Amino acid sequence: TLSEAWKRFIYHQFHDDLTGTSIPRAYEFSWNDELISLKQFSNVLTSSIRSIAGQMDTRVKGTPVILYNALGFPVQDIAEVEITLPSAPKGITVYDMNGKKVAAQLLNYADGKAQLLIDASVPATGYAVYDIRTSGSTNNPVDVANHTIENSIYKITLDENGDICSLLDKINHKELVKQGKVIRLALFTENESHPWPAWEIIKETIDREPISITGNVKISQIENGNLRKTLCIEKTHGESVFKQYIRLYEGSRAERIDFYNEVDWQSTNALLKAEFPLNVENREATYDLGIGSVKRGNNTDTAYEVYAHYWADLTHRDNSYGVSFLNDSKYGWDKPNDHTLRLTLLHTPGTTHNYAYQDRQDYGHHCFTYSLIGHSGALDHTSTVEKAELMNQRLKAFQTDKHKGTLGKEFSFVTSNNRNVIIKAIKKAESSDEYVIRVYETGGKSIQQATLSFAGDILSANEADGTEKNIGNATFNSNQLQIHIKPYSIQTFKVRLKKSMQPDYRSEYANLSLNYDRKCASFNEFRGEANFESGYSYAAELLPDSIFINQVPFHLGEKDSFNGMTCKGDTILLPSGNTYTRLYFLAASASDNDCAATFCCGKSKTELVIPSYTGFIGQWGHTNHTKGYLKDAEIAYVGTHRHSSGEDHPYEFTYMFKFGIHIPKGATSIILPKNDKIVLFAATLANENLPEVTAASRLFRTAIKGNHTGVPTDDNPNKENLLKTAEILSYSGYANPYEKPEYMIDGNKDTKWCDTGMTPNYVDFDLGKQQHISGWKLINAGEESHSYVTKGCFLQGKNHPDEEWKTLDRIDGNSRNKVERQLPQPAQARYIRLLVTNPVQDAEGKDARIYEFEVYK
C-alpha cells in the first residue's frame, strides 16, 4: 500500500501539475489522487502505530494517548489532541511518560470528543505514552473584543483594520514592526498577466503599492488559555472573505507566533501576500532550499519573485537581531527593500485571450499557516531548520486502551547525538532486509561528526547512493553508527539490525466464504461478459488474487467467474464454535451513489456508508468547478480504469473499500443489509492480539470547507427540480404511452422517456417564469445496457418563444449513466430544451432512453 500510494502521489510532481498551470479538468484527477494517497498514508501509519502500541506499557490512571514523533530529532512542542470521552470534562490534567504533570489546555468538547493542547516531549523517531485525566476546572474565556494579546515573550497590538501595528519582543526589548508600517495581508488589486498568466507574476504588479483589507473588520479574542491565546480577525474585500487567527503560545512554543488563515477567495485580477515590514535591515535575506540555504538581495528586474521551501529569514546587517518566517504550504517570496519580506499566498491573474479560464484560478476555500520567530543574534540555521521541520511534521496522537508492554512508556528507533546532523528519512530497503537511513547536515559551516544510536544492535552497515547501491563500508559498534559529513551534504546508509527479541503479537485470520452471485470483472478480450453496474465492470487484468490491507488478508474470487455477493438481506453463518471477535470485508456500491447499510451480528448493529465503486474519492473545492468533499471509508483497492462491453474507460477509477464489524461473544451469524446495490468481494474473520488504536489528531490537512468528510448517500434533497412542475410544450416523439416525456421528470427512477424516432431527439419545457439555472442532471438507461447511455446532448434555453435556442451546456463523448453538471456560467431562462444528438454509445443508434432529467437553480 505504501509504495502504491507514494507512486500515485509522485505522478503529479511535475512541471504543469505541481505548479498550478494545468487545465482545471486535470486537477480533478490530481486532487483525487492526492487525497487517496493521503488516506492510504494515514491508514498505514495508524496500522503501524497499532503494532508498536501493542508492545508499549499504556497502564495509566486516565486515558492513554501515544504521541508519535516522525522527525529524526527529539521534539518538545505543543501537541493538538482530540480524545473520545463519555461526557464533557470540567478540566483536564496530563502526565508524561515519567508520571510528571505537564501543561495542558482544554479547548472544546463536542460530539463526544474533547480537544486539548499538551506541552509534550517525544524522542527522535519515537513514541511516548501520556496520561490524560479529567479533573478540576478550566478557565478559558472567549469572544472578547480585544486589540492586544501577549505572552511571556511577545506583545501584539492591532490597529482598527486588524493589522499588526506593534510587535514587541519583551525579552530583548525590541519592536519588530517598522515605524509607520503594519504587518498585514497585502492585496494587489491590479495583477494582469497576459502571455503566461498562471506562470508569471509581472514585475509591475509587485512594484505597485498594495492595499490593506478593510471591509467589515471584526476583532475578537477567542482563546485565553495557559498554553495558547488567540485573536481572530475577520474581514472582507469584495466577494472574498478572510479569517485570520493570530496565536501566541507558552511553554515549548512560546517563541513562535502562528498566523492561521481561512480564506474564501473570490477575487480576480488580484494578488495576495503576507507583508512583513521589519525593524531590522539587510540588503540580503536567507532562503531555505530544502537542503541548504541561499542568500538573495532585494528585488531586481529579473529576480523579484523567488522561492524558498520551509523558511526564510531577515537578520539585521550587524547580526544583532533577526526574524525567521516559517510556512506550511507557500513557496514564493519577494523583497522590495532592505527591511521588508513578502510571502505570496494567492494569485489570480487578470487575463485576456490566452488561458482565459485562469482568471478564476485559486477561487475557493484555502487554509494555510505561516509563522514568525524573533531571534537575538545571528541566524542559527540548525535551530531554524528544526523549527520549520516541526511545523510541517507535527506530533501526532493516537488513543488506545490500557495494557502492559515490554517497550515501556517511551521508545525511539534511532536518534542522532549531533543537532547539526538530522535524520531526514528512514525506509525499508527495496531489495534486502536492511533499513535505509538518510541524513543531512544543517549548519552549513563545517564537517560534522555524529553517532546514530539504534534500538537494536547493528549486524552490518554500508554507505549507499540514492539508488541504494553500496558505495563503501560504514563504521559501527554495537547499536551505534559513526558518521562524518560535509556541510549541507546528504549521506545514505544501509543498516541491518539484529532481530528483535520482542514478543510476536501475531493475529489469527481466516477466510469466510461468500456465496458469489455476480460477475464483477471482465478481461479485455471479453469485456461484455460481466456487468457490475450499468454495463460496466472492474478490469480483471488489474485485480490481484488477494489483497493485504493494513495487516488483514483478503482472498478475492476467481477473476473470470462470479466474484461478488449481492446484499439481499442474506444470513451468513459463522464457523461452528466461533471464537473470532471481528469480521472484515471488502465492499462497494454498484451505483453512482454511496449507500447507507446496516449489518447485524448477534445483538449488535453496525451502521456503515458503502461508497460508490467509481468516481472520485474526494475533491478540493474550486468555485463554479468542484465542491470539496472526502469520503470516509478505508480504501483497499484502486483500479485505473473500468470496462464496458465495447471499450476500456481510462481514468474512470474503480475501488473496493475495507470495513470491519465487531462479533459479539456467542454470535452465530451475520445478517447482511437488503440492498442489491451493495456488493461484497471478500470477507475475513479475525482474532487480533493488538490493542484498538484510533487517530487522536489530524493526520493530514485539507482545505475542505466545514470539515465536510463525505458526499450525500443519495441525491441531494435540497436540490429542487425546476422541471417537476414545468409544462411540456413539444417533443420529437415517444415509443409508447408508458414512455412519454413526462416520465423523465416525475422523480421516479423506474420510469423513462423513450423515443425511437430519428435523431435529434428533443423535449421542450416551459418553466412558467424566468428562472436562475446553475446545474442539471441526467440519469440514462445504463441499468438496461451500457450501450443505452446517452453519448451526446445539449441543454438549451431561452426567455421568449420567438428567440433562438441558446446552448447553456453540452455533453459530448459521455459514457456515464448518471451525469450531473454545473453550468459553465449560470443562466436565466424560462424555456428549456433537452436536445439529444447521440442517444446511444453506438454511432449508428437512434433511440433515446432517459430515466430522469432535472434542472436546478
PLM segments and residue spans:
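Aromatic, loop-rich ligand-recognition surfaces of beta-strand-rich domains
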Residues: I572-Y580, A588-N593, K677-D714, N736-T807, ...
